[in-house]
């Protein structure tokens, strides 16, 4: 499957191209800069996104189930409909993020996320 090829993904990130609907399940993408990218409906289940930059990204309806978001920056990210069940979020920053439900905010806070007040 072409969109699971890491070189393909990194080329799109580098060129700042849309990643809408992409399948990135279980990939190691720590420290990658996804800032301001379109990641709507992306499947990021089980991804390691520790220290990744997702500032201003559109993660509407993205699947982040069991994603590792430790120390990731999701400031000003659009997260309406995003699934964050089981996400590890210690030290992750969500300052100015939009679209999170009250229950998701409480869950993320309980996991050590910041910027959710």
PLM regions: where:
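Tandem repeat scaffolds
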Residues: 1-117
């Amino acid at each position: 499957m072409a969109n699971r090829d890491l070189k393909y993904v990194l080329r799109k990130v580098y060129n700042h191209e849309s990643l809408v609907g992409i399948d990135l399940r279980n990939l190691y993408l720590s420290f990658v800069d996804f800032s301001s990218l379109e990641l709507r409906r992306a499947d990021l289940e089980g991804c390691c996104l520790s220290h990744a930059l997702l500032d201003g990204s559109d993660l509407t309806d993205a699947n982040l189930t069991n994603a590792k978001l430790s120390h990731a920056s999701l400031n000003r990210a659009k997260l309406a409909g995003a699934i964050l069940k089981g996400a590890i979020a210690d030290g992750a920053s969500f300052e100015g993020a939009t679209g999170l439900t009250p229950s998701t905010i409480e869950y993320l806070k309980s996991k050590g996320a910041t910027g959710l007040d």
